[in-house]
């Protein structure tokens, strides 16, 4: 724990060297950011607020490298699902870090043997999950989960005065070997460190504040119990002291008691001159005062925060005024002054690159003659309520009535319904509340801070004489009528789902893929089932391959019946005949896969001769090949055999039933498959950066299980669902497959909380459908950012059009398609989202008066350009 950090001026020198040498691959914008960070980090922490998809992680990884080169240590705090991406970026930047730290068990495992020479505090860089401190501790918790605090206390006391605490040696609660060895290692390292070391001060405070034998009471470690903070600090001692703390997705978990906040304030121990580097595309989402929270995360002093808060508030007010009176010279002058003050207040702490500096967006602007923001097109998928069935008209009418009635009651159920709408749940979402799943949608419910809306006559509905509440209950009963008679299939006829299906299929027919976001699992699953059922019937009718041998479940059959009716296929659908047709075409598909199996090993080997794989991939391939060679042909043909599973994966990824696949395609697909199935350092038990035969064999056994789970699915994969229960490995497989232009899935349907961060889904898709639009523009920006990234399909298509000099037509754009019930609260929902989006753009995008607002002032083009030109600019290059 006695590392010698050379200081921030040395870090600055290393950063400048990286920008000049380009040892790490950097674009011009990233290099400009590093140059600015070299100026600012010696003085204070910094917020990197680059727009989604512009490469913030590469910048942060480069800073981590520079700090380590200067003798410092780095902690990187990331959402649980981003460990894979960070592992890649750190390796690209030449930074070695162990796998993301997720749990107490994993933390203690570092001390499973006494001779293990790499405790956490010896690592130069650590990646820690935001959820690391979400420990569920209470009276019945097993001792090893809380024993580190009393162990460290006891050992420090013994070290300091030569005596163990009373009855320590005979206490059976403190007999866990890992905990004992962890405490011994931590205390020994602290005792050997200088007197002024931060760990010395903290452990002495810990020894003063830890009660004995009170520290042996499990109940004292609960969420808000007395010893919980001290246990968190004890764990932090084992991580060591950090000179740089990087916080990814820093807009998340803003609450004081959130897991991320506890990590920052209790667990991560900072050196005296430590800096915080936060990363977020949306530092402010709904309220300009959220800047204050973000400044707090980079440890800005109170006086500077107060001054910044005042400037931010004044700017927000002046934006509102100048939008109302753009022709008023005094108002414009006041706006310019407040914009300058806003810029000065945040300039030392904020860097932001946005799409104005993106080469593809500049090309679009030059070719189209439109504003840079026009490369995105927002166009509603409108549902005409006049065309609905009488049952659905009544349901929509009831939902509208609820949105009105509940505004006028203060009772609990009314508040729930009102919050449902207030959190961005328009009419489509309000109806879908009926199909919320307590378990599968728990994270979404927690994120919304909205309780379950009762839809049955039960104790959840408060029986009261309140007439307004009774009216709300009556309207609620009307709203559920479409679902009462056909509970299993009603969602397949949901107007929002049908409208989305029509739009999605039209885009897929053009050879592109579609990303769909929604909130509730059951409607999303129904959308996936219906899309798959419709595509299955089309394939059967056209005698095309479909990766399914029979109809599997009654729910799937309900979707197929609905699809049969919607597609207006002739006659009554016979399940037996359909199963026969599926079996016949599936046999043809299996024959293709068998052909792949026969040549798979030789194809991959030939591909590897043309382009050598990394040692890790080669070691895993050798284990795979050996397992195949040791088994008979009969065993190899078994569906569970590794050869069969990998062949199925290759069939999907390479589209091997075409004649164009080459050995190089197979080899690259195997490399991609290994990358998706595992973390880069997974299986490397001895930490030497390579896989020996035993390590490779152990890892391959695990990868085979993951591959089997993904590629032995019984249903077709035209559309796939990603929700809270989707495993990390499956998410990576889905990302890999979705980013390939050919093959399934064509449609990825993602629950908002799961799919809006950490996934790059841009290589074959430029359209985002919002089944349940939000009211938080920051969330929508994150969703769109999955496809609006460097190297996207949109960029590729734009370059093709410009190169082909076809710019007379409509240029390709990023398409944003919210599903909206025309003439209902949904339209209000979308309008408010636009208003909030405009506020966000005024602070971060340089668009004070958006094209939507500018339509009100057709003769004020010059004044609007003047106003937008005066907007604050936090670009590292100083201009846009």
Where do the model's predicted regions map?
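Conserved acidic functional residues
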Residues: 50-51, 772
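Helicase motor interdomain insertion/brace
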Residues: 1-48, 54-740, 749, 754-759, ...
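C-terminal substrate/ligand-recognition segments
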Residues: 746
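Short, electropositive, low-hydrophobicity segments enriched in small/polar residues
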Residues: 59, 762, 789
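Conserved SF2 helicase motif VI
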Residues: 776-805
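A short beta-strand element within the Helicase C-terminal
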Residues: 293, 759-773, 782, 815-818
